[in-house]
Amino acid sequence: MLVNLQTVLKMAEDGGFCIPAFNVYNMETVIGVLHAAEETKAPIIMQIYPRLMKEETGYFLSPVVLAAAARASVPVCFHLDHGPSELETTRSLRYGATGIMLDGSTLPFEENIELTRRVVETCSYLNVGVEGELGHVGTTADADMDEFTTPEDAKRFVEETGVSCLAVAVGTAHGRYSKPPKLDIDRICALRKATNNTALVLHGGSGVPDEEIRKAVAAGIRKMNFATDICYAFLDTCLEELQKPNRAVAVDNFMKKPIEAVKEFCISRIKLVGADGKA
């Protein structure tokens, strides 16, 4: 069933687990993610990058995600990931998104607050929750990767914007790590306390050691993003299949194993964050 961001976040908060948020790129990744959620009876988030939303892909992929969510036997939120502007968030709302991320993390603090507050106000009329970001979660190519989020800034940001959840910088990055990251668990605990237990979001979940993920969930992470490993699961399996002399030629048959690879990866993350059986 299609639900809004607030619904899955409340489920996670009440149950003390984390909602896995999987980035999808085509119909095959949507199918893999959906099958994983239904098989494990887990509430999930399917999210799309803004670059896909503003291309032809978004125009055609959004109805696929909405149809998958509508027929799903588990709660599914359709979420915009890293929306950089009001234009992008408005486009995603028109496409049917039930959750919006407004990423103003590279802006000056005051501008980030003001932009996020405006988007929260707009989305409130449609009962759509908003994820903000404070402290910059960079890429694995960045020298320092993060500008860590401080409890003082987080408290003010949450109070003045009214976000449903807050993405924080605590030691992760986007992309594939050259060495396993170590999360600042004490900072996560401090951020939760400062924000009156606001749902916190961890970006860059791909490649984080399992034990670090468990600690982060226990400390209060309620949404965790997985994108890079979705891509590797799909593409690596495609490459393996292409090397086989007797590979399927019909595209639908060829895609069965990549879909299965995405499903198996998602199942592993669903169980790791404790979302299995929570739908």
What are these regions (language model features)?
Residues 3-14, 25-52, 59-75, 83-198, ...:
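Alpha/beta enzyme core
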Residues 2-3, 269:
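Bateman/CBS regulatory modules and CBS-like beta-alpha motifs in cytosolic regions of diverse proteins
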Residues 17-25, 49-53, 253, 257:
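A short N-terminal beta->alpha junction/helix N-cap motif
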Residues 209-279:
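C-terminal alpha-helical cap/extension of soluble enzyme domains
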Residues 202-204:
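Thr-Gly-centered strand-to-loop micro-motif
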